[in-house]
Amino acid sequence: MNQEQVEKSKSVLGEDTVKMLLQVHEDAIWILGNLGIGCNNLEILKQFQILEEDNQAIVYENRIYIMPDLAERCLKTVPGIAEFFAPRNSFFIGGTAPYIYDDAAGEGGLSPSLGHMIRIAKTAEKSKVIAGMGKGVKLKNEILQMNIMAEYCGKPLYFNVNSDAAIENAKAIYAKRKNIMAMFNLTRSPLQVNENVSEYFVKAVKAGLPVFISAMPLAGVSAPYCYNGVLAMTHAEVLFGICTAQLLHPGITCIHAGYPTIADPRLDYHPNFGLISHNLANILMAHLNLMLDIPTCQSAGMTHEAKLTERSMADTRMGHALCLKYGFHIMRHSFGFLRYLTDFSFAKLDTDISIAETVTPADAPEVEMPVYDERGMASVRQTGANMYKEDSLTTVNLGKIFVS
């Protein structure tokens, strides 16, 4: 634990909220040891089976249970933030929209082209407020997309690597420049390895590529409906990825890219990325990782609007201002995205950049900092690795938190 950062976090978040975050870490460790992570990948299972003799892990019926000492040991071998190539308070273009929004016609659903990708990469390289980028949009050829990003943007990059050819291409890029990350959604919530990508995660780690480990538990669906509950589930899933990476390749760079997300009952329990609460939850996730001295990338500055509107601009300003007020390491999804990250709008990209150039911490709304809610872990113990939509905490908290 970085004690200097603990004190900094206390000064901006308050002592009770920092106490909550430290307990979130303990809760995540409990989840790994008592609920475990379902896994069918033989290589990953093997890494933990080796440790059963020393009581550092248990593998039972294709479920991995990680003991606290092992989790803490693995965290100690992760290179810290000072050794990482992206500075604090970095906003990234991130995410992977399947479509382009036609701002002139006022409709989405256009297929992204090479020209769109080049434009995004050039914009990221040129803008002083954009510190790095993910893909932004999805092209069918992931290798071509990686190469476009590397050619047109010299800033830190992250991209998915979902094939042997993509692994080899990422290795070739990494040999020339070290500021890239291989992104993996290693888990699918709640608490299950995503077998579609686990093979390539193992290969990327063995190749020494920095791994960007994402997880997206949804409060009220796949996680408890309170701040510390969804933070703990998010943290547990990413910690599993970090532990796996450190066992396969001790000392490899890991980026904690878990982003807690909130189901909105007004939207039939779909996520609402425009909530103040979404930004705050991700800022809190960032602070926990800053205190643990782990490179960290969350999600902020988004909107629930389906096109560029006054509300979408207000959402961008609110998210950026909150991040600047409280501090963070890296935030993604901060430029160009519309509702559900489905459409990417160039008009919104340009507007978001203009907002980021002028926004200040003084633009942030007042927020009530959360404190620890014991019912969050009570829900975890009761519901476990099942769905939380009918959980008693979800029903009692509807309309009381995550509402603005």
Where are these regions (language model features)?
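Ligand/cofactor pocket segment of small-molecule handling proteins
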Residues: 308-352, 356
